[in-house]
């Protein structure tokens, strides 16, 4: 057991609050982004960064939804979640799900984040039978897109 001083505890609390606030700001900025042909909305720097990664563009089309509530039963328990970004293509019978993460060192909570996106996929597959539902984590520190199976 370590002996933490009050100062250590306050510094830890300040760091957590800073990280939470930064994550909230990043999520808000990402919610505003649309890149669909000539239609471009949102923070210019973020849009420019996203455009460097062509694999991200299908997530930022005009019909993309943000902060999408989803709920259902998983392993006998009621689960309610909110999806950061979702694109539904009824013609292709496909749904793309993206969850933003602001961690610079993703290893610490990677399994938790992966499980979170897997829950989204399970809930959506029950709601949209016959659709292919694909999930991804977007690491905002380097705009790396990670597929979740």
Which residues make up each language-model segment?
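Mg2+/Mn2+-dependent nuclease catalytic core
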Residues: 77-149
